[in-house]
UniProtKB/Swiss-Prot annotation:
Name of the molecule in the record: Histidinol-phosphate aminotransferase
One GO CC annotation: cytoplasm
EC numbers for this chain: 2.6.1.9
Residues annotated with N6-(pyridoxal phosphate)lysine modification: 230
């Protein structure tokens, strides 16, 4: 099977020349090239910052540090076909949502081509597809056994019978399922489909390990999305990462706005990938996983809560089913927790295979203790009305 990216990416986008400016060639000296305000920021408290200058459009320092970390933690060190990631394999976006939109625009002709999603899944794939007038095809995860794994045979049948599908989105670990999709299943699709790209969204991967990012050097039809919003605790800076072949990363970098990553986002992202802060991220992820198991034990021991969690334990949240799938009770519990106890969780009962389910993010030890107390009190009160 020979993969040719030119058959996937829209021709004008494949040949797109990126925006260039004088700052690409010269970064020091008296900078009079970009029509900036050389007098500095107008807020007095920002006068000593460099915020009157446009940010670095390439972010090479961050890209180099991030790919170095993914290489260090790679599960594929013994696979000779997997090469080290470099900055050339990375494109940055304003959160993963910008990356999702860019990939759809790059590969799918509006009003003609399609994407494939695996519900229950992250809704932004469909939102971005609809905005771009792209049809959404669905192939559900295996919900009957509660595993929420990919039905690879069904997926391949759909892909091989519909040549207009150009992208397949896999959320791993899943949202709202919390289940990591087995890499072997993803690889089977990669090995048997060359008419599009498999996009693996790994927002929660640091809570379970085993990122597919290094595999983009082995499979040219693989794209891996990650973010600093979850394990790194930097949701506020909105920085997403797209790992791809150097060929595809070049195209995505040509498509992006010239200065899409702000100076402040860049500053904090660079701090996040310092060795000491990477260790802190790993330690915090471990604490979250420990608290997740405490929450699981406490909540599934309650009356009116199913004694088995739904989906997986691979993210920073739990999916808990109320009273055998009682959407009415689950929705009341969701509302009462927020309005009476100041605890906001997420009702997910309308998602495929998630009837009666609440998605609960793992908080601090104190927040989780508060949740457990009021969850029990509120649930028992509502169930006995």
């Amino acid at each position: 099977m020979v993969f040719d990216l030119k058959r996937i990416v829209r021709p004008k986008i494949y040949n797109l020349e990126p925006y260039r400016c004088a700052r690409d060639d010269f970064t020091e000296g008296i900078l009079l090239d970009a029509n900036e305000n050389a007098h500095g920021p107008t807020p007095v408290e920002l006068s000593k910052t460099n915020l009157h200058r446009y940010p670095d459009p390439h972010q090479l320092e961050f890209k180099t540090a991030m790919t170095k970390y993914r290489n260090k933690t790679s599960s594929y060190a013994n696979d000779p076909e997997v090469k080290p990631l470099t900055a050339d394999n990375l494109c940055l976006g304003v959160g993963s949502d910008e990356s999702i939109d860019a990939i759809i625009r790059a590969c799918c002709v509006p009003g003609k081509e399609k994407i494939l999603v695996l519900p229950p899944t992250y809704s932004m794939y469909s939102v971005c597809a609809n905005i771009n007038d792209i049809e959404v095809v669905q192939c559900p995860l295996t919900v009957s056994d509660g595993s929420f794994q990919m039905d690879t045979e069904a997926v391949l049948t759909i892909l091989k019978n519909d040549s207009l599908i150009k992208l397949m989105f896999v959320t791993s670990p899943g949202n709202p399922t919390g289940a990591k999709i087995k890499t072997s299943l993803i690889e089977k699709v990669l090995q048997n489909w060359d008419n599009g790209l498999v996009v693996v969204d790994e927002a929660y991967v640091d809570f379970c390990g085993g990122s597919t990012a290094p595999l983009v050097t082995k499979y040219p039809n693989l794209v891996t999305l990650q973010t600093l919003s979850k394990s790194f605790g930097l949701a506020g800076i909105r920085l997403g990462m797209t790992y791809a072949t150097a060929e595809l990363a070049r195209i995505l970098n040509a498509m992006k706005a010239p200065y899409n990553i702000s100076s402040l986002a860049s500053e904090y992202a660079l701090k996040a990938v310092q060795d000491s802060n990477l260790k802190k991220m790993e330690a915090t992820s471990k604490i979250i996983n420990e608290e997740k198991m405490r929450l699981l034990k406490e909540l599934t021991a309650l009356d009116y809560v199913d004694d088995q969690y739904v989906g997986g334990l691979d993210a920073n949240f739990l999916l808990i089913r109320i009273n055998g799938g009682d959407n009415v009770l689950a929705k009341k519990l969701y509302y009462q927790l927020a309005t009476q106890s100041g605890v906001v969780v997420r009702f997910r009962g309308n998602e495929l295979g998630c009837s009666g389910c609440l998605r609960i993010t793992v908080g601090t030890h104190e927040e989780n203790t508060h949740l457990i107390k009021y969850f029990k009190e509120t649930l028992y009160k509502l169930a006995n009305e």
